[in-house]
């Protein structure tokens, strides 16, 4: 037994040197990404663009001026663009164009959980004097949390996997994104003529179909209190439309990502209720998806699904450790 253990140790010994080269390799990989950076609209590659929260986080951690500029510029264009649901909050799946104007309209829990933390980190790494950008990032985080709580929370306290891209128009015909699209007449009907005219130069309409319906995009300096009030009015009007279907499946890793995002963003932006929300979600996740040391990957309407995989255990461990640090409750470390 001892000789076997010694043999294993000797076999693994070369691996101990790997961390020494990990940092420069990671830096080189991040530098290489710059070749695909869109200096005008932010993001990487194209014309189809994904937000890529993990890459943005890596740029924020790297922290040199070039990396920070790429992350901040990308986050600003994400929040101003049609890929962000200006009316209801939350990010769509990806953009079909280089300007983040016309998204694929599906909304996923994991994208929004990760981007919630990214927006808060970007806020933290942006100078105090750049208040316009900081306000954009914190606005995106707050509207995203509001959307998650309004539309994604399941009766058992967990969060649904996503929202479909398609829904029906007034005539019962199915279209992608129709639930989220506007034209000037629809905005005027909801807000009234005077308010719609005030909003017109600040919120650009990007047509997505032959009917002139389009996504909303923020322009110029934002008067947040008034625009948020207008968006809330539009949200109420939109609530009378046929909504996209919700994927009612609860996925362990994705809910754990949200725990991590709520803790991180709550601590950074001093939204302490988000940390409490993360604690409640962790409690629900532990109750619903854990049994005698084994975890579920999924559940559907409280019916257990398949067993957990490595991703689920990793994200639960990470998020529970962060929650323990934020709350001082050792029970999350025990879990």
What are these language model-derived features?
Residues 1-268, 299:
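Replace the tail clause
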């Amino acid at each position: 037994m001892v000789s076997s253990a010694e043999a294993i140790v000797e076999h693994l010994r070369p691996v101990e040197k790997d961390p020494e080269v990990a940092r420069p390799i990671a830096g080189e990989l991040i530098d290489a990404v710059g070749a695909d950076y869109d200096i005008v609209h932010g993001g990487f590659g194209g014309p189809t663009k994904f937000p890529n929260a993990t890459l943005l986080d890596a740029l924020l951690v790297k922290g040199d001026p070039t990396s920070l500029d790429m992350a901040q510029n990308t986050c600003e264009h994400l929040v101003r663009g049609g890929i962000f649901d200006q009316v209801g909050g939350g990010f769509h799946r990806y953009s079909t164009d280089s300007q983040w104007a016309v998204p694929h309209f599906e909304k996923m829990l994991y994208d929004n959980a990760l981007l919630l933390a990214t927006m808060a980190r970007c806020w933290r790494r942006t100078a105090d004097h750049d208040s316009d950008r900081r306000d954009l990032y914190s606005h995106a985080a707050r509207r995203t949390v509001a959307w998650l709580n309004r539309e994604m929370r399941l009766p058992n306290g967990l969060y649904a996997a996503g929202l479909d891209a398609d829904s029906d128009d007034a005539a019962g015909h199915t279209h992608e994104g129709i639930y989220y699209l506007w034209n000037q007449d629809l905005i005027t009907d909801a807000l009234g003529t005077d308010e719609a005219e005030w909003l017109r130069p600040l919120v650009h309409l990007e047509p997505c179909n032959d009917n002139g319906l389009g996504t909303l995009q923020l322009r110029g300096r934002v008067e947040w209190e008034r625009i948020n009030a207008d968006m809330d009015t539009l949200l109420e009007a939109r609530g009378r439309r046929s909504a996209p279907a919700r994927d009612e499946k609860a996925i362990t890793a994705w809910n754990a990502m949200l725990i991590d995002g709520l803790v991180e963003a709550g601590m950074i932006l001093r939204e302490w209720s988000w940390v409490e929300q993360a604690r409640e979600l962790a409690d629900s996740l532990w109750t619903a998806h854990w049994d005698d040391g084994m975890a579920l990957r999924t559940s559907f309407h409280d019916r257990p699904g398949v067993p957990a995989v490595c991703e689920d255990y990793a994200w639960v461990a990470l998020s529970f450790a962060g929650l323990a640090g934020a709350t001082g409750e050792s029970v999350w470390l025990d879990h």
